[in-house]
A protein has these predicted regions:
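Short alpha-helical oligomerization interface
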Residues: 1-6
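Residue-level signal for the nucleotide or nucleotide-sugar donor/cofactor binding architecture
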Residues: 8, 49, 53, 75-81, ...
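Active-site helix of classical SDR
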Residues: 9, 13
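NAD(P)-dependent short-chain dehydrogenase/reductase
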Residues: 20-74, 80
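Glycine-rich Rossmann NAD(P)(H)-binding loop
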Residues: 39-41, 68-77, 99-107, 131-135, ...
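Amphipathic alpha-helical segments that line or abut small-molecule/effector binding pockets
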Residues: 81-89, 159, 163
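Mid/C-terminal beta-alpha module of Rossmann-like enzyme folds, strongest
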Residues: 86-132, 141-142
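Amphipathic terminal alpha-helices
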Residues: 156-175
Length: 175
């Protein structure tokens, strides 16, 4: 395992909390470090959100006719359905420890945007990301989790989920 070096207070606090929990609960705790989840939230209440997700920002911008040029940027994403499958396996196997829950590979935002925009019939313009936007690229190593629960986690599953989201969102908007 690699040495963790959090670079912001939020990350430092999460790591500090993990250490306290591990110290107090030893081998009776499951800590999940979850990547960006992608799914349809049919029960969305935007008034209660702490921050916007990538999907929130994407659909807000696409409604304005804007898509950001994200050619070089990548992150790690996981469909909400795959996340549910992973959680179910973890519960059934009574797993304890610390695990990264993710696809475990780079997902270029351009590719993700193309999937999410598949059913969009409206015109839009592609613009460069403003310099002021924070564009941190990362992906999580999920080898430990995949070995533990023996599950297949594939990019094609994320692609299918994104296309289903696109169909759901744009079919509703195009009516």
């Amino acid at each position: 395992s690699s040495k963790l070096k959090p670079n912001c207070n939020y990350s430092k606090n999460k790591l500090h909390t993990e250490k306290i929990l591990l110290k107090n609960l030893k081998n009776r705790i499951l800590i999940l470090r979850i990547s960006n989840l992608i799914g349809i939230n049919k029960f969305r209440n935007n008034n209660k959100k702490i921050h916007k997700t990538f999907i929130d920002s994407f659909f807000l911008n696409v409604q304005r006719g804007i898509i950001f040029n994200n050619e070089k940027n990548y992150k790690d994403f996981l469909s909400i359905n795959k996340f549910g499958e992973i959680i179910e396996k973890l519960i059934n196997k009574k797993v304890v420890g610390i695990y990264n829950v993710s696809l475990g590979q780079k997902v270029y935002l351009t590719k993700l945007v193309n999937w999410l925009n598949l059913f969009n019939k409206n015109k839009y313009k592609s613009i460069d990301i403003p310099k002021s936007y924070k564009t941190e690229c990362f992906y999580l190593n999920n080898d430990k989790l995949m070995k533990k629960i023996n599950i297949k986690n594939r990019l094609i599953d994320l692609e299918k989920a994104c296309k289903a989201i696109s169909k759901f969102f744009f079919k509703k908007k195009n009516k």
